[in-house]
């Protein structure tokens, strides 16, 4: 019975989500977004059926629908895997997309082609559902590329803006670099394992050295989840509309790389190299992104860098061989990250598209509900006890402090945790507190549509961590006893960050405006000089190409081209003229020579 209900619910979800996509364009003035977010709402209610059955029976189900390709040595089947990861994530993604689409009906109300915008968001969601429910790598790759192309279309939605076009191209290019690793893994498994089925890969991989495909998977996750070296596209992605940023950063594209490593983690847990790379890469990413967020003044860019920092923390959990903790943090992070972006969008919309936090302030009086939800989201991000982020973040840090694996990675992660509290409190202080520093606008009225939507996500940011912690079965026995200083390490560094953030925010108002920023400020504001380094290589390539073209055009081309021929003819003519050889014998000799050459050419080509 369960084997029938699971695929039927997935088919029903896709059918409901496809209805707004197949519906022809409506020219009426009615709210076209109602059908989109209502379809997602119904799909979310349907997804609760397999989630309830999964929590009740606690068993995985693999359903094969039909065979795509069948040869003597290689088969590709369309199959779906219904386990705790896929069923839980599908419900969370539908819930968050429902809230985001409802928010978009208010945020994008005055924009043309908003109906197409809702369809793009639905396709974005459907691609992610295909990715998380796939049971073979080829099917997973379809969802992988689906979220990639939809992110390109949505980030560049305002195609009249140069920054949006640049950001969309940047996202595609960096993700193509990550796709090289995925394709390398697909090719290796096709050559040596003769299968892309995930269950068969787990069985067959025990007899092979899986270092090469593991490195390929890490490269793929580095590109898609914006880890260090392939990260610059993620802060730029906030050039898209706020609903796009909320969906992309919370429950779709950026977590696809982490989910790929979670899904294929059994082939990595016995290898020492791959988890070590994940651990060090995640620690470096989380500290780097937190450092960059300290000096940013764009409200959306601060939230974007916090996403990159939390993705690094998820990568650390995978490096600790704790993929269930990484998935736990994906689920809790999705709620408060979507809420933070929607709160930021509501504030920007209310302040006439102002995004600089230095020009805000006093929103606690003008936007009390939005400000309260923003504060809850930031507290959940910091890991405040008993909010959603605390349960997952504290579990990862406890596993880190008791792992005895890498003191360097532990130190970087704890520093990044402290920096998270610093930039979170700085944002709350500059946006919500104090007196307004923006221009005087019309009376700001909090619309019930965005506040109700954000309130729904706020409840998730409060209780989701507790609920998921009771339903998730850990893959390893958790640490039950530890020294008190290790138990309190996460809370202590967070409190230290709050104190430091308060001190920095108060001192910033006393600093002379003419003070020249130092190297640490430029180091942070310029994203650790990565844009400079990434531009340096293309600039050198263009310069070398220009130099080569100039040399060829002005030297070799003219030497053997028009200038060379003209110089040769002039030399011959001058020689004939100077030596007075202009006689009938000379003319006859030249004439006969020309005829002989012509006959030889005709003989050669006939």
From Swiss-Prot:
Main location: mitochondrion
Gene Ontology process terms (BP): electron transport coupled proton transport; mitochondrial electron transport, NADH to ubiquinone; mitochondrial respiratory chain complex I assembly
Catalyses which reaction(s): a ubiquinone + NADH + 5 H(+)(in) = a ubiquinol + NAD(+) + 4 H(+)(out)
Subcellular localization(s) per the UniProt record: Mitochondrion inner membrane
UniProt enzyme class: translocase
GO cellular component: mitochondrial inner membrane; respiratory chain complex I
Keyword NAD found: yes
Pfam families tied to this protein: NADH5_C (PF06455), Proton_antipo_M (PF00361), Proton_antipo_N (PF00662)
Top-rank taxon, per record: Eukaryota
Database matches in InterPro entries: NADH_DH_su5_C (IPR010934), NADHpl_OxRdtase_5_subgr (IPR018393), ND/Mrp_TM (IPR001750), NU5C-like (IPR003945), Proton_antipo_N (IPR001516)
GO molecular function, a single term: NADH dehydrogenase (ubiquinone) activity
Transmembrane region(s): 2-22, 36-56, 89-109, 115-135, 140-160, 178-198, 212-234, 242-262, 273-293, 302-322, 328-348, 371-391, 405-425, 462-482, 488-508, 519-539, 556-576, 582-602
Statement: the UniProt record of this protein carries the keyword Thylakoid: no
Protein family per UniProt: Belongs to the complex I subunit 5 family.
Function: Core subunit of the mitochondrial membrane respiratory chain NADH dehydrogenase (Complex I) which catalyzes electron transfer from NADH through the respiratory chain, using ubiquinone as an electron acceptor. Essential for the catalytic activity and assembly of complex I.
The protein's name in its UniProt record: NADH-ubiquinone oxidoreductase chain 5
Taxonomic lineage from the root: Eukaryota, Metazoa, Chordata, Craniata, Vertebrata
């Amino acid at each position: 019975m369960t084997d029938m209900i699971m695929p039927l619910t997935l088919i029903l979800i896709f059918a409901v989500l496809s209805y707004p996509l197949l519906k022809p364009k409506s020219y009426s003035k009615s709210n076209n977004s109602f059908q989109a977010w209502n379809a997602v709402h119904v799909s979310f209610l349907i997804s609760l059926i397999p989630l309830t059955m999964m929590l009740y029976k606690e068993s995985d189900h693999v359903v094969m629908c039909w065979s795509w390709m069948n040869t003597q040595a290689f088969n590709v089947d369309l199959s779906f895997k219904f386990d705790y990861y896929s069923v839980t994530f599908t419900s969370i993604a539908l819930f968050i997309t429902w809230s985001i689409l409802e928010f978009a009906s208010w945020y994008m109300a005055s924009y043309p082609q908003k109906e197409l915008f809702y369809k793009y968001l639905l396709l974005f969601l459907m691609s992610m559902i295909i990715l998380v429910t796939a049971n073979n790598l080829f099917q997973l790759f379809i969802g992988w590329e689906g979220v990639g192309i939809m992110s390109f279309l949505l980030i560049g939605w305002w195609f009249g803006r140069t920054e949006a076009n640049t950001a969309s191209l940047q996202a595609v290019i960096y993700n193509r670099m990550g796709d090289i690793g995925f394709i390398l893994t697909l090719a290796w498994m096709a050559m040596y394992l003769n299968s892309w089925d995930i269950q068969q890969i787990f069985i067959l991989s025990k007899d092979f050295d899986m270092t090469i495909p593991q490195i390929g998977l890490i490269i793929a996750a580095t590109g898609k989840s914006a880890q260090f070296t392939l990260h610059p596209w993620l802060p730029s992605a906030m050039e898209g509309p706020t609903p796009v940023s909320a969906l992309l950063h919370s429950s779709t594209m950026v977590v696809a790389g982490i989910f790929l490593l979670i899904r294929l983690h059994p082939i990595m847990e016995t290898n020492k190299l791959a988890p070590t790379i994940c651990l060090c890469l995640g620690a470096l990413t989380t500290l780097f992104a937190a450092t960059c967020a300290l000096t940013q003044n764009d409200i959306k860019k601060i939230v974007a860098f916090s996403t990159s920092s939390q993705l690094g923390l998820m990568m650390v959990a995978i490096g600790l061989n704790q993929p269930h903790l990484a998935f736990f943090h994906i689920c809790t992070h999705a709620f408060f990250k979507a809420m933070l972006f929607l709160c930021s969008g509501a504030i920007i919309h209310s302040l006439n598209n102002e995004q600089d936090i230095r020009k805000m302030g006093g929103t606690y009086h003008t936007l009390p509900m939005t400000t309260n939800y923003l504060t809850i989201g930031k507290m959940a991000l910091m890991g405040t006890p008993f909010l959603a982020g605390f349960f997952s973040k504290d579990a990862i840090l406890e596993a880190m402090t008791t792992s005895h694996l890498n003191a360097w990675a532990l130190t970087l992660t704890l520093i990044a945790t402290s920096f998270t509290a610093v930039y979170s409190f700085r944002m709350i202080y500059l946006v919500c507190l104090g007196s307004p520093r923006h221009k005087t606008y019309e009376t700001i009225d909090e619309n019930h549509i965005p506040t109700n939507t954000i309130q729904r996500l706020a409840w998730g940011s409060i209780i989701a961590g507790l609920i998921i912690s009771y339903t998730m079965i850990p893959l390893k026995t958790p640490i039950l006893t530890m020294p008190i200083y290790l138990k309190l390490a996460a809370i202590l560094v967070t409190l230290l960050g709050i104190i430091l953030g308060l001190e920095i925010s108060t001192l910033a108002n006393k600093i002379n405006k003419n003070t020249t920023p130092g190297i640490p400020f430029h180091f942070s504001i310029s994203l650790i000089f990565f844009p400079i380094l990434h531009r340096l290589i293309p600039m050198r390539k263009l310069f070398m190409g220009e130099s080569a073209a100039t040399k060829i055009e002005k030297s070799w081309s003219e030497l053997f081209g028009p200038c060379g021929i003209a110089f040769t003819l002039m030399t011959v003519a001058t020689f004939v003229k100077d030596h007075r050889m202009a006689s009938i014998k000379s003319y006859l000799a030249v004439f006969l020579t020309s005829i002989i050459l012509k006959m030889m050419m005709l003989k050669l080509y006939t």
